[in-house]
Swiss-Prot record:
Gene name as annotated: swrC
SS bonds (residue pairs): none
One GO cellular component term noted in the UniProt record for this chain: plasma membrane
Family membership: Belongs to the resistance-nodulation-cell division (RND) (TC 2.A.6) family.
Any GO BP annotation: response to antibiotic
GO molecular function, a single term: xenobiotic transmembrane transporter activity
Keywords: Antibiotic resistance
Record's function text: Required for self-resistance to surfactin, an antimicrobial lipopeptide surfactant produced by B.subtilis. Also required for swarming motility.
Note: A SwrC-deficient strain is susceptible to acriflavine and ethidium bromide, and showed severer growth inhibition as surfactin concentration increased up to 100ug/ml.
Protein name, as recorded: Swarming motility protein SwrC
Entries under InterPro entries matching the protein: AcrB_DN_DC_subdom (IPR027463), Acrflvin-R (IPR001036)
Reported induction: Not induced by surfactin.
Lineage: superkingdom: Bacteria
Native organism: Bacillus subtilis (strain 168)
Length: 1052
């Protein structure tokens, strides 16, 4: 230690230079750090999506979902497998253990799916990773005062999208509501009859002609060359002029087609049909131009609807790359849009969802809290030291420690987010502690009349004297955060950047206190250090110290009374716990709202549009609504993935009063006017909905769980502290099954697949082919009449052509069987399940959860039905358990560090008695401020373990020193108490002052590092500091009697 201080005092210029370099590097690092809302948390989820056209949910569940589930459920690290089977599609979500490498998991899942046998019509499964980065960071609405939607689409697709995709950090640009150009193809039924053709034969001819087949390498002379057969239909004109063989030429092909039966023969049929075209050209077989039997036209239509404030618009979603800076990407996109607007008259844009705004606001608010906190701390130090030079030396550690922390964080590629900024706000009061203790000791000894040392020797010895207590207190505070890394899961990942920031800042503050502080003290107090001691009263204990000395002496003489009072206060504070209640995280208020509309089964797109328009009108008539933007029919996962689902983004004015009440009222009004599907309020913020209570009901079938789900739903709807209660029970819609009469079919030379093909042509299907126009490929789609059927009779009357050319009604060869089917089939770990969710409106989530659980426990349900909790109640139980274990581990680590530092077990044991009394102030603080015991309050309690122990260390270290000098234990305690009172109070009050802006809960900021954390630390620090000054000396004096060795032999 002597060598370090001597080096610093001899090489002041080198220390100054190093300080300047570190300051500049820290400022540069801080200005160039990525800004995010929360740390990039690993989301251990994979989603497997499979499309199975034309299949009902039950078919999808049996033929696609089940084989996929079986393939992945036993993979390494799989925790839960949840699946939902819809019409035409399957979605399987795999939840892994948090420790799982998700890149490896994706590879393993892909390998497992290679061996799965799926129906021929099912598409290959697609695997995607769930990530917060897969959500848009910007949702934009663009419109034009000058151009129509067609021209605006051209502007957006041809120019704007490419410009936005070119911005660094943009992963994808998703467009909705634009007009899509395609070729529409509709058959002329009378002409088909005239030429003896049917739709299937014509389609096969077109698809068979429009193929490109590589034939491999052929040898020509001495060279090998590739040969390719190309039948590409290049243009719309080519398609119209295409020749189709008429009945006489195609009868053989039709016969072959009809006998082939299954769809697996389709490729052969297409090739055969194409061969007939070639044959007809050489043998003069009669043909007809395609344009004579079908109407082919170039059309422009909007695949999805996008509207903003009642006008047609185009929606644009910006998704950023994983490693990109949200704020930078959003700013660059907005700058590009501003430039595009200047270049295109009439072009307008607005952002309905901007994830950069809350990030910027959180960063600015946290910075302001940090600055105010630093000012409070400086004022408090100045009031105690009453010396400007000493104050300046102390507070230099605040900016320098934080800049060093920023420098290290940037090197580790940790972003500037609410966790790192919150840690700095919290650390401000603590990083100054070491410097205060050192400078206070230098300043105190400098003013002592009987101080034998002067100059460098005094600075060196005064710094050295305090090195052990400040080192052990810093190590203890750092050690408290080590168990957070062991917590694992989302909490662990969320708080690791928080813990690292505090660790780096405190480590930096320790180094500064033994290098820069003694150097500055020697420079600024040169005259005082080299001259005679300053005439002052400081060598005598102050008035406050004398009062404390008398109180401590009384407490030591009346140990039982003092201890009983302290214990009663502790037990009394525990009765506040039920009154305070518990929650996961406090709610975060952004003046935006997201609504989704899920149509009921069988609801048409037109009906869904009417529902959306009614909601739009209600929203536009609301006071304080700034922007209403919605998209419908985009099939967005955010809108539930339904092809006719709608997603609304509503932006309110920033000064909207009672926003929570407004959200509830507007949702109720929209739900009231809707007589079809389901309206829900969603939360797409980075933190999600923190107060959603969920119950899962499992059973063997949906019929088994239906009654139990409805009972739970009723219980939750009757609870006044719950809103937006919904169940995941699937709806049902009518199903018509065409049962083929095989005997009749075989007599007519028909197959069941021909019935399927004829009926399938009425539903959406893959494009027939593609053609080129202006360098772009356009899909050729057969015009369907899906919405135009009045009853199932219309389908029964549809005709198919037999092998002999005879037209047969479908109703003559198949009977219709009426039934019903679920719109979804949901399973979790192989069991059918439905969830019931509700949003808790009360701060006391645990009380609401307990009240509902009590009623659910009384429910009478079948033996094969089970109920499980999820949502916020499961989150609270999980996080509180993990943090409780982290606290126990932190206490064990602290004790170990103290034993090593003091070289014995008794003094550290006495120091630990400062911990229980933090609970008193923490609970009183939460109760008075109206906060709940939440995740951030628990983190505050964890921090207190490190902070309060430091005060006891400073006190007991002085006691041991004085015992070594020959004082009795009582005398040493009284002397140490009066001497160490000022640095203990200074460090405690400086920490409290730094946290006051956080505890006052200024507007904005973060959910995690918020008022609850500030209040917990301030309250706990007040109670523990006051009781530490009495209880720790009492425990130390009692334990001193048990020591076998003489006083003062513990290592100094």
């Amino acid at each position: 230690m002597n060598h370090v201080i001597n080096f610093v005092l001899k090489n002041k210029f080198a220390v100054w230079l190093m300080t300047i370099i570190v300051t500049a590097a820290g400022l540069y690092a801080g200005m160039n750090m990525k800004q995010e809302s929360i740390p990039d948390v690993n989301m251990p989820y994979l989603t497997i999506s499979t499309t199975y056209p034309g299949a009902t949910p039950s078919q999808v569940a049996d033929e696609v979902t089940k084989p996929v589930e079986q393939a992945v459920q036993n993979l390494d690290g799989v925790s839960v497998v949840t699946s939902t089977s819809y019409e035409n599609a399957s979605s399987v979500m795999i939840e892994y253990d948090y420790e799982k490498d998700m890149d490896k998991a994706k590879t393993e899942a892909a390998e497992a799916l290679e061996n799965v046998n799926l129906p021929d019509d099912a598409k290959d499964p697609e695997i995607s990773r769930y990530s917060l980065n897969s959500f848009p960071i910007l949702t934009l609405s663009v419109s034009s005062d000058k151009d129509n939607l067609q021209e605006l689409t051209k502007q957006v697709e041809d120019s704007l999208v490419s410009k936005l995709e070119g911005i660094e950090g943009v992963a994808s640009v998703q467009v909705s509501g634009q007009q899509v150009e395609e070729v529409e193809f509709s058959f002329k039924e009378d002409k088909l009859k005239e030429y003896g053709l049917d739709e299937d034969t014509v389609k096969q001819v077109i698809q068979g002609s429009d193929v490109t087949t590589p034939l491999g390498l052929y040898t020509f002379g001495n060279e090998e060359k590739s040969v390719v057969v190309s039948g590409d239909i290049e243009t719309i004109k080519d398609l119209k002029n295409m020749r189709i063989p008429t009945a006489s030429a195609s009868s053989a092909g039709s016969s072959a087609a009809s006998q082939a039966g299954a769809q697996s023969a389709q490729a052969a049929q297409s090739a055969q049909a194409a061969a007939q075209v070639q044959q007809s050209a050489s043998t003069a077989v009669p043909t007809v131009k395609l344009s004579d039997i079908a109407t082919i036209k170039d059309v422009k239509k909007a695949e999805s609807v996008s509207r903003t404030n009642g006008k047609d618009s185009i929606g644009i979603n910006i998704v950023k790359a994983n490693d990109a800076n949200t704020v930078e990407v959003a700013d660059d996109v907005k700058a590009e849009l501003k430039k595009f607007k200047e270049d295109h008259k009439g072009f307008n844009y607005s952002a309905t969802l901007d994830m950069a705004e809350p990030i910027t606001q959180s960063v600015d608010t946290m910075l302001s809290k940090a600055i105010f906190g630093a000012i409070f701390a400086i004022v408090i130090i100045l009031l105690f030291l009453r010396d400007i030079k000493s104050t300046l030396i102390s507070v230099v550690s605040i900016p320098l420690s934080l800049l060093i922390a920023l420098l290290v964080l940037q090197q580790l590629d940790i972003t500037l987010n609410i966790m790192t900024l919150g840690a700095m706000t919290v650390a401000i009061g603590r990083v100054v502690d070491d410097s205060i203790v050192v400078i206070e000791n230098i300043y105190r000894r400098m003013r002592l009349k009987d101080e034998p040392l002067r100059g460098k020797a005094l600075v060196r010895e005064a710094t050295k004297e305090m090195f052990k207590p400040i080192m052990s207190s810093t190590i203890v505070t750092i050690a408290v955060f080590l168990p957070l890394a062991l917590v694992g899961g989302q909490i662990g990942e969320l708080f690791i950047p928080f813990a690292l920031t505090i660790v780096f800042a405190l480590a930096a503050s320790l180094v500064i206190s033994i290098t820069l502080v003694p150097m500055l003290a020697h420079s600024l107090f040169k005259k005082s250090l080299t001259g005679a001691p300053i005439k002052a009263k400081e060598h005598k204990p102050g008035r406050l110290a004398n009062i404390y000395k008398k109180v401590l002496n009384w407490a030591l003489s009346h140990k039982w009374i003092t201890s009983i009072i302290a214990v009663l206060m502790l037990l009394g504070s525990l009765f506040l716990v039920p009154l305070i209640g518990a929650s996961y995280l406090p709610s975060e208020e952004e003046k935006t709202m997201q609504l989704t509309y899920s149509p009921e089964p069988g609801e048409t797109k037109k009906e869904a549009e009417n529902e959306a328009e009614k909601a739009e009108k209600i929203l536009l008539d609301r006071k304080h609504v700034d922007t209403v933007q919605y998209s419908l029919g985009s099939g967005s996962p955010l809108a539930g993935g339904d092809s006719n689902g709608a997603l609304f983004y509503i932006k309110y004015e920033s000064d909207t009063p009672d926003f929570d009440k407004e959200k509830d009222n507007v949702l109720k009004e929209i739900q009231k006017q809707s007589d079809r599907g389901e309206w829900k309020s969603q939360d797409f913020s980075s933190s999600g909905n923190n107060n959603e209570l969920t119950y899962y009901v499992y059973g063997d079938s949906e019929n088994d769980i239906k009654d139990t789900v409805k009972d739970i739903e009723k219980i939750m709807k009757d609870e006044k502290d719950l809103k937006n209660v919904n169940s995941g029970l699937s709806s049902t819609y009518d199903e018509y099954t065409f049962v083929a009469d095989q005997e009749k079919l075989s007599k007519l030379g028909l197959t069941a697949s021909q019935i399927s093909q004829a009926l399938m042509s009425q539903t959406s299907q893959e494009p027939l082919t593609t053609v080129k126009k202006d360098g772009k490929e356009l899909d050729v789609n057969i015009k369907t009449e899906k919405d135009e059927y009045k009853s199932v009779k219309d389908l029964e009357n549809k005709k198919i052509t037999s092998a002999t050319g005879q037209e047969v009604k479908i109703g003559d060869v198949a009977k219709v069987k009426e039934g019903s089917t679920s719109d979804t089939v949901s399973k979790r770990d192989g069991k059918v399940y439905a969830d019931v969710t509700g949003e808790v409106t009360s701060d006391n989530v645990t009380a609401v959860s307990a009240a509902i659980q009590k009623k659910i426990d009384k429910l009478d349900h079948p033996d094969n039905v089970s109920i499980d909790t999820g949502g916020v109640s499961a989150d609270i139980a999980d996080s509180f358990t993990k943090l409780g274990l982290a606290m126990l581990a932190a206490i064990a680590i602290v004790y170990l560090v103290l034993v090593i530092t003091f070289g014995g077990a008794l003094a550290p044991f006495a120091i630990l008695f400062s911990l229980p009394f933090t609970v008193i102030g923490a609970l009183v603080g939460l109760y008075v401020s109206g906060e709940t015991i939440s995740l951030n309050a628990m983190i505050g309690m964890l921090m207190l373990i490190g902070i309060v122990v430091t005060n006891a260390i400073v006190l007991i270290d002085r006691v041991i020193h004085k015992e070594a000098e020959g004082l009795s234990t009582r005398e040493a305690l009284l002397e140490a108490g009066s001497t160490r009172l000022r640095p203990i109070l200074m460090t405690a009050i400086a920490t409290i002052g730094a946290l006051i802006p956080l505890a006052l809960g200024f507007e904005g900021g973060s959910q995690v590092i918020s008022k609850g954390l500030g209040v917990t630390v301030i309250g706990g620090l007040i109670s523990s500091t006051l009781l530490t000054l009495l209880i720790v000396p009492i425990v130390y004096e009692v334990l001193a009697k048990f020591r076998k060795k003489k006083p003062g032999t513990e290592e100094e």
